[in-house]
Amino acid sequence: MCSSDLKKYEGQGLTLPRRQTLASAGYDIEAARDITIPSIWSLNFVRIFRLIRNGHNLIESDFLQAEEVLKPILVPTGIKAYMPEDEVLILANRSSNTFKRNLSLPNGIGVIDSDYYNNPNNEGEIFVQVLNYGVRPLKIKKGERIAQGIFIKYLKTDDDQPIESQRLSGFGSTGKKGGK
């Protein structure tokens, strides 16, 4: 179940995800605001690529710049999703994103665990990680469909060990001290 009751988006007229056809598995997820996704090519990626390809020794600032250029952009959705403990929300790319817009999800899929919703340090807003490999910046308008969400039940192994720790934060917090 998705909701748009995030405090920072109150009164902004966000649309809850919905399926487009009777047999659709995925709920279309929209951008919560206008955002421009820069092209990796316009962010000095070509220079760094040539240095690597030609066997040049890179210095630390080159590595830092490459990491910054290839860092995904987080597109806010303004929604959060409540699920039972044995469900997960999978975020998948829309086929039109890669085919028509040169937009990819660099993590392949997004995994939204049930305990991401309203944990102590994170209200649970869902973001979609994207990377624009097209040659131009891509403008995404509020309300444009940017991903699809699929709710899936999952199983645990017979020898799964009980876990006492709870999630305390958001992105990248699983398994870190003070995170989960």
What does each model-found stretch correspond to?
Residues 4-180:
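DUTPase catalytic domain/fold
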